[in-house]
């Protein structure tokens, strides 16, 4: 039975919870078609997070990997297009590290694109009633760090054998209550969005060609 690996992060920056972990763990063990979802938590720590996802790739040998992270301030589920080879941390990670203008992989490519049908995923998430969009930046904190590390590792595999990408998600309502004016999505909406994204990624190899860009 094929495995779909979903990863979420531990809480960071004084948050008591991280919506990425709450959402992915709700799907742990669920079957989508003939595949089964396995959810695992990553540390919000530079270096250690890439090491952890690498170990999961070795032990689980998934057919599909979607890493998920918190993006407080965003109003939609953001399916990321590209990971860039730089750490530039506005805040320290959970181990106190704050790399500035540091390559994630020395002499690695400047960027990697997700190998998921990102526009088809957004289309189907919206059709399911979930606010979603294509995002052109995963930031320069641990989320982008993991996204780049994941894609660098998957680049070793024969093309198309293991596909991967990243989805950013908004705060949960209980977090937004601590950050007045910030948008949020209910946990059940986030779970529905991830379930839909997984189903589309499993069933769709070639992405749709439709508008998904931004002017700025």
From Swiss-Prot:
Localization in the cell? Cytoplasm
The reactions it catalyses are:
Release of an N-terminal pyroglutamyl group from a polypeptide, the second amino acid generally not being Pro
Q: Which PANTHER family match?
A: PROTEASE FAMILY C15 PYROGLUTAMYL-PEPTIDASE I-RELATED, PYROGLUTAMYL-PEPTIDASE I
Identify the keywords attached in UniProt to this record, alphabetized: Cytoplasm, Hydrolase, Protease, Thiol protease
**GO cellular component entries:** cytosol
Q: What does this protein do?
A: Removes 5-oxoproline from various penultimate amino acid residues except L-proline.
According to UniProt, the name of this protein is Pyrrolidone-carboxylate peptidase
Q: Which InterPro entries match?
A: Peptidase_C15, Peptidase_C15-like, Peptidase_C15-like_sf, PGP-I_bact-type, PGPEP1_Cys_AS
Provide the active-site residues from the annotation. Answer: 80, 143, 168
Which terms does the UniProt entry file under GO BP? proteolysis
> What Pfam families does the annotation carry?
Peptidase_C15
UniProt keyword annotation of Hydrolase present: yes
Q: Which Gene3D superfamilies match?
A: Peptidase C15, pyroglutamyl peptidase I-like
Please name the HAMAP family in this protein's record.
Pyrrolid_peptidase (MF_00417)
Q: How does it assemble?
A: Homotetramer.
Asked whether the keyword Cytoplasm is assigned, the reply is: yes
Q: EC number(s) on record?
A: 3.4.19.3
Q: Which family does it belong to?
A: Belongs to the peptidase C15 family.
């Amino acid at each position: 039975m094929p495995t779909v690996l979903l990863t979420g992060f531990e809480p960071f920056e004084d948050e008591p919870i991280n919506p990425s972990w709450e959402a992915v763990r709700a799907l742990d063990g669920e079957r989508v078609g003939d595949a089964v979802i396995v959810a695992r938590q990553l540390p919000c720590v530079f270096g250690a997070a890439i090491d952890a996802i690498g170990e999961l790739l070795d032990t689980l040998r998934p057919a599909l990997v979607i890493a998920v992270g918190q993006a407080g301030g965003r109003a939609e589920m953001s399916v990321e297009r590209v990971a860039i080879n730089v750490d530039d941390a506005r805040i320290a990670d959970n181990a106190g590290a704050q790399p500035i203008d540091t390559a994630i992989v020395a002499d690695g490519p400047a960027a990697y694109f997700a190998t998921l049908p990102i526009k088809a995923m957004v289309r189907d998430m919206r059709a399911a009633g979930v606010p979603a969009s294509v995002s052109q930046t995963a930031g320069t904190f641990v989320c982008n760090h993991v996204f780049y590390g994941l894609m660098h590792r998957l680049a070793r595999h024969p093309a198309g054998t293991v596909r991967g990408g990243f989805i950013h998600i908004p705060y949960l309502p209980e977090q937004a209550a601590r950050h007045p004016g910030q948008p949020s999505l209910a946990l059940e909406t986030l779970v529905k969005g991830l379930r839909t994204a997984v189903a589309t990624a499993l069933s769709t190899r070639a992405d749709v060609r439709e508008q998904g860009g931004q002017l700025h």
